[in-house]
């Protein structure tokens, strides 16, 4: 088979170039069907106990993921008529959105007062325009009811907080866009505005994934281009390696889209887990192409003949690249058995990209090299690169000092094993983003000044009319609030 491939590729170079390109273009059309999914909960196994509990809460109480809007000014009290007027307008505009199920703010909350032995329930903010006396009454009521205040006003009375709950079937990216649009349109530049909450974070993920992938690919390709130019010293050779990389990426992304189109399966949605796929495939495809081109130049120095050099290169490289690709594909395909369903799509799609990189490296690449008119006096052909000379020197040191190299490898391995005991697992979504960015600053602000961007929902089954049930809820809340990372808790027991 190897001899047949070598003969066929070198005898039909144009065919070996055109067919892979046509296949790449066809597969690339599948990108139109690619779906970017922002639902982080969808990545959890359906049989996970906490996921089942979360689904039960969703089914009974609706969406548990909210967006927070906080506005105000540092070192300035929020208790003034203009702020209450804006809060009223913003709340009403948010309630008018078809994507919004519920809005919670001072403008929607009720107050319970005792009048002549009777319980009187009224609106906490009765009108949009308030007098200073009415504002003082609202402030006094909030000071007496700290659990309500913690949800509506910041710790230092500088910011108002609004909680927006979407309908369960509304995508978070859609929800995030409409809420931010309303918030920015109503609130003036006189106020600091902060957005947060899990729905806001996950709604921002699709755009962030696209931006991050674009930046990472540009940086990766730039670094790769510099290294390849230093090593290969030939623009055409570098371009051919890039052609292998880009076509592999296109086929991988296109295959993912085609699978969504043909199966409709969420396993092939592009989620935050998949954001590492392009960089991983880039390195693998680059490795295949560079191995081939570097070996070709090495043979050219000896034989001074393109076809003979290609024959020897293909005869030497084809099987190792095939075995490397096969074992890598097998490793990624094993993700099909992972409990997280998106990992199945991850493994299959990146395996397709790896397979295409192998095909391109053994057909398209040698065919393109064979039709190129090479300058036998160029430095790429006549002299070994600095990297090649360094590796040759290193190889001699390894073979002449086997015990030292083996001991050093074992020592590094032991240090790595010790490091495993210091490994930390971080599940805080805020740590995904760099400090100092607008996104991270808003999350930190709501965590520090408000009730926080993350919450825990507890679903209790029992009679709400039974005093013992309510007392147990109160005990549970007290236990939770003893945790220094819990800012507040509330339940029907607080109302009763």
PLM segments and residue spans:
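A short beta-strand structural signal in non-transmembrane regions
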Residues: 67-73, 147-184, 194, 455-463
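Juxtamembrane segments of multi-pass membrane proteins
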Residues: 401-496
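Extracytoplasmic
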Residues: 49-52, 93-164, 171, 181, ...
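Membrane-embedded transmembrane helical bundles of large multi-pass transporters/channels
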Residues: 1-38, 42, 55-56, 128, ...
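Solvent-exposed, non-transmembrane loop/terminal regulatory segments of multi-pass membrane proteins
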Residues: 32-78, 132-152, 395-396, 422-464
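N-terminal pre-first-transmembrane
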Residues: 67-102
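Solvent-exposed, non-transmembrane alpha-helical starts
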Residues: 43, 64, 77-85, 122, ...
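Short amphipathic alpha-helices in soluble, non-transmembrane regions
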Residues: 83-94, 174-183, 472-480
């Amino acid at each position: 088979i190897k001899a047949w491939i070598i003969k066929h590729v070198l005898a039909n170079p144009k065919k070996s170039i055109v067919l892979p390109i046509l296949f790449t273009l066809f597969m690339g059309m599948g990108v139109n069907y690619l779906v970017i999914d922002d639902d982080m909960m969808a990545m959890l196994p359906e049989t996970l106990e906490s996921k089942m509990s979360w689904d039960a809460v969703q089914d009974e109480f609706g969406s548990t993921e909210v967006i927070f809007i906080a506005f105000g000014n540092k070192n300035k009290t929020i208790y003034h008529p203009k702020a209450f007027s804006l809060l009223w307008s913003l709340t009403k505009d948010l309630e008018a959105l078809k994507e919004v199920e519920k809005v919670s703010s001072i403008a929607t909350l009720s107050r319970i007062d005792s009048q002549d032995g009777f319980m009187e329930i009224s609106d906490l903010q009765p009108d949009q325009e308030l007098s200073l006396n009415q504002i003082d009454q609202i402030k006094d009521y909030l000071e007496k009811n700290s659990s309500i205040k913690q949800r509506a006003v910041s710790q230092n009375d500088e910011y108002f907080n609004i909680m927006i709950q979407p309908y369960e079937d509304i995508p978070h990216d859609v929800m995030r866009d409409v809420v931010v649009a309303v918030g920015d349109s109503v609130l003036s530049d006189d106020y600091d505005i902060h957005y947060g909450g899990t729905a806001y974070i996950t709604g921002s993920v699709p755009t962030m994934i696209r931006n991050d992938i674009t930046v990472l690919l540009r940086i990766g390709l730039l670094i790769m281009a510099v290294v390849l130019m230093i090593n290969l010293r030939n623009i055409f050779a570098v371009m051919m390696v890039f052609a292998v990389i880009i076509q592999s990426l296109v086929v991988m992304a296109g295959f993912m889209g085609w699978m969504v189109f043909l199966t409709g399966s969420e396993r092939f949605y592009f989620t935050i887990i998949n954001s590492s796929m392009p960089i991983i495939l880039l390195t693998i495809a680059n490795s295949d192409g560079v191995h081939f081109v570097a070996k070709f130049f090495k043979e050219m120095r000896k034989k001074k003949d393109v076809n003979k050099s290609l024959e020897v290169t293909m005869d030497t490289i084809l099987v190792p690249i095939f075995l490397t690709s096969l074992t890598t594909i097998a490793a990624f395909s094993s993700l099909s058995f992972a409990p997280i369903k998106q990992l199945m799509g991850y493994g299959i799609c990146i395996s397709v990209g790896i397979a295409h990189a192998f095909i391109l490296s053994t057909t398209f690449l040698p065919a393109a090299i064979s039709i190129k008119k090479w300058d036998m006096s160029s430095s790429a052909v006549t002299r070994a690169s600095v990297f090649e000379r360094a590796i040759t020197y290193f190889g001699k040191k390894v073979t002449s000092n086997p015990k030292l190299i083996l001991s050093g490898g074992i020592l590094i391995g032991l240090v790595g094993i010790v490091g495993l005991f210091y490994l930390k697992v971080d599940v805080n979504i805020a740590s995904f983003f760099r400090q100092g960015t607008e996104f991270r600053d808003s999350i930190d602000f709501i965590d520090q000044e408000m009730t926080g961007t993350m919450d825990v929902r507890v679903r209790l089954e029992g009679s709400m009319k039974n005093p013992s049930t309510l007392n147990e809820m109160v005990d549970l809340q007290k236990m939770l609030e003893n945790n220094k990372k819990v800012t507040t808790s509330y339940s029907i027991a607080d109302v009763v």
